């Protein structure tokens, strides 16, 4: 069996090493190279998180964040070219968290995602004159349906400190008309319980 090529009789050893090194580099490139060129790290900063209970998702993997944490990095790399959306899937019991710079397409490592958390408060008030069912009130996507005879209400979802709220009647009770007083404002440092709903 003959060799694919024949070295000259005086082929310099140094030149031979260069040829072999080049061949090895080509072979390694053909095997795929480093995985870091096809996947990116997704990370960011957290401001104001004091309580446990925050979970973040990027559409590919999730990470549980402990109270007091100021940075995060998703453990699984995001495939190059894949779209990502960072958002909270669970929140601390007494905080709400919002995400800035949380979406995009993975073209390089991302470390600019910002998660901001603030205290959250209950939103509710009093009801007078409600004698029938089917009353539905909303605050954005937050919904509450007081039963006939109810004298107070609290929305199931808490509202973040500094966030605006606007309570409206989505559905009137049977044969009654309800109006909302003090239903618009901004959440301060305590729960809101001054909203009045009068039904006639």
Language-model regions, residue ranges each:
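Bacterial N-terminal signal peptides that target proteins for export
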Residues: 2-20
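Bacterial Sec-dependent N-terminal signal peptides
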Residues: 2-6, 23-47
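Short domain-boundary/entry signatures in modular proteins, especially
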Residues: 33-41, 115-124, 200
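A short, amphipathic beta-strand motif
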Residues: 40-48, 123-127, 167
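Short, ordered, surface-exposed loop/turn motifs in non-cytosolic proteins
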Residues: 49-62, 130-142
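Short, acidic Ser/Thr/Gly-rich low-complexity loop/linker segments typical of extracellular
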Residues: 60-71, 141-152
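Structured interaction patches on ligand/partner-binding surfaces of diverse proteins
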Residues: 66, 87-119, 168-200
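Short Pro-Gly-centered beta-turn/loop motif in secreted/extracellular proteins
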Residues: 69-87, 92, 152-168, 173
């Amino acid at each position: 069996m003959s060799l694919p090529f024949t070295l000259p009789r005086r082929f310099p050893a140094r030149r031979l090493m260069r040829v072999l090194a080049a061949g090895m580099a080509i072979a390694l490139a053909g095997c795929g190279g480093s995985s870091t060129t096809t996947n990116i790290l997704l990370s960011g900063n957290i401001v104001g998180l004091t309580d446990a209970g925050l979970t973040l998702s990027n559409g590919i993997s999730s990470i549980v964040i402990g109270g007091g944490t100021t940075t995060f990095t998703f453990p699984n790399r995001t495939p190059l070219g894949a779209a990502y959306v960072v958002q909270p899937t669970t929140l601390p019991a007494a905080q709400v968290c919002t995400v800035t710079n949380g979406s995009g397409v993975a073209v390089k490592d991302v470390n600019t995602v910002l998660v901001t958390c603030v205290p959250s408060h209950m939103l509710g008030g009093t009801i007078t004159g409600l004698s029938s069912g089917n009353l539905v009130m909303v605050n954005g996507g937050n919904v509450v349906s007081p039963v006939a005879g109810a004298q107070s209400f609290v929305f199931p979802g808490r509202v973040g400190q500094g966030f605006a709220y606007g309570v409206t009647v989505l559905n009137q009770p049977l044969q009654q008309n309800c109006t909302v007083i003090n239903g618009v404002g901004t959440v301060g440092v305590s729960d809101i319980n001054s909203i009045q709903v009068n039904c006639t």
